[in-house]
């Protein structure tokens, strides 16, 4: 599978992809995937690296009052987003797909989302009150539903 094949497989569902995915996230991932394959990085290592970025983003968002941390959180989430696509592309490119890898990917995604919402909640609730937790729970529920719907549409 060549460079173009990696890009095509990542954009096979264009109608459900966002502009940033199509024009930034997937193209960067399509360039990174063959490099990681040559370096013999495992898809699960990519998933876990993405999860580490997500957890660090949650910590950075907890400190969002300092604009440097807010920017760091954003940058870490962009890296997570790229790695979240690369792990599957790498698994397909190197023929290392597995059910265990899918589970690791799902856990990594959920740990990332919980980390971000938790970081924001811990930062905002002392200032704005406990209603922040209800709002974040609602946002997390909506996010989970959107992610599940996206995955179902992507697999069709």
Annotated model-derived regions:
Residues 2-33, 110-156:
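A feature for the membrane-embedded catalytic helix bundles of lipid/isoprenoid biosynthetic enzymes
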Residues 1-74, 78:
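Topogenic membrane-insertion module of multi-pass membrane proteins
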Residues 69-128, 147-154:
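Acidic (Asp/Glu-rich) catalytic motifs at the cytosolic membrane interface
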Residues 49-56, 72-79, 111, 118, ...:
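Lipid-exposed faces of alpha-helical membrane segments in multi-pass integral membrane proteins
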